[in-house]
Amino acid sequence: MAKGIFIVGTDTDIGKTVVTAGLMHVLRSRGYNAVYFKAALSGALEIDNKLIPSDTKLVSDVSKLEEPYENITPYVYRTGVSPHLAARLENNPMDLDIVKEKYVYLKEKYDFIIAEGSGGIVCPLIDDGRGVYTIGNLIKDLNMSVIIVASAGLGTINHTVLTAKYIENLGIKIEGIIINKYEKDLFYDDNIGMIEKITKLPIVAKLKNIKDMNDNEIEAIRIHSEKAFSAENIIKHMEQL
């Protein structure tokens, strides 16, 4: 039976896709049968009249994952807004049964699943008149625990603590926090220490700020993730699905 973890960011564009790509690379490059899953992506690329989920492409390219995009990201939207609104604008509402079918398929095919959210923990996926269904609801339905991706910079204490407390209030287990865009600095280190004290959560890893992303994005992520993560530590924080 597969083991897995759900990656949640404290905000949009916090770098959780880069972190997820790095985690996937470390596992797969060491022979672990790992797969990526993202239920919905908005703001997709359009290449040759076909929508390409950019996050899914990046993770797949970095980790050399060859699973078809439609199996690991079942809902892809062109419009770069929250998935619930993109679904309404493009008349393509999410069907949770399809999302869960894809997830079960991946659980049966792979040994490890790293899932990634859209936006933050409260990002709405569905708003169909019966209530709002968020990333938090999806995590509970998939019965996954989470790792929070946070920055080390200004505002991170507030963002990270609020995210952690909200997740805990949902009854979801938090395995720890990964700090992204980290540099050795008194200010950053004090922020990280304060987050640990207030949340009582471990810092799982710190990923450096990847400054050479534009030159060779894929190779830069691989190199820096190998310094920040170990396969054993990643697996240690996964739970049976």
From Swiss-Prot:
One of its GO terms (cellular component) is cytosol. Keywords: ATP-binding, Biotin biosynthesis, Cytoplasm, Ligase, Magnesium, Metal-binding, Nucleotide-binding. GO terms for biological process: biotin biosynthetic process. It is an enzyme of class 6 (ligase). Its EC number is 6.3.3.3. Mg(2+) binds at residues 17, 55, 116. It is found in: Cytoplasm. ATP binds at residues 13-18, 55, 116-119, 180-181. The active site is at 38. Pathway: Cofactor biosynthesis; biotin biosynthesis; biotin from 7,8-diaminononanoate: step 1/2. Substrate binds at residue 42. GO terms for molecular function: ATP binding; dethiobiotin synthase activity; magnesium ion binding. Pfam families: AAA_26 (PF13500). Its cofactor is Mg(2+). It catalyses: (7R,8S)-7,8-diammoniononanoate + CO2 + ATP = (4R,5S)-dethiobiotin + ADP + phosphate + 3 H(+). Belongs to the dethiobiotin synthetase family. NCBIfam families: bioD. Homodimer. Catalyzes a mechanistically unusual reaction, the ATP-dependent insertion of CO2 between the N7 and N8 nitrogen atoms of 7,8-diaminopelargonic acid (DAPA, also called 7,8-diammoniononanoate) to form a ureido ring. This is ATP-dependent dethiobiotin synthetase BioD. It comes from Clostridium kluyveri (strain ATCC 8527 / DSM 555 / NBRC 12016 / NCIMB 10680 / K1).
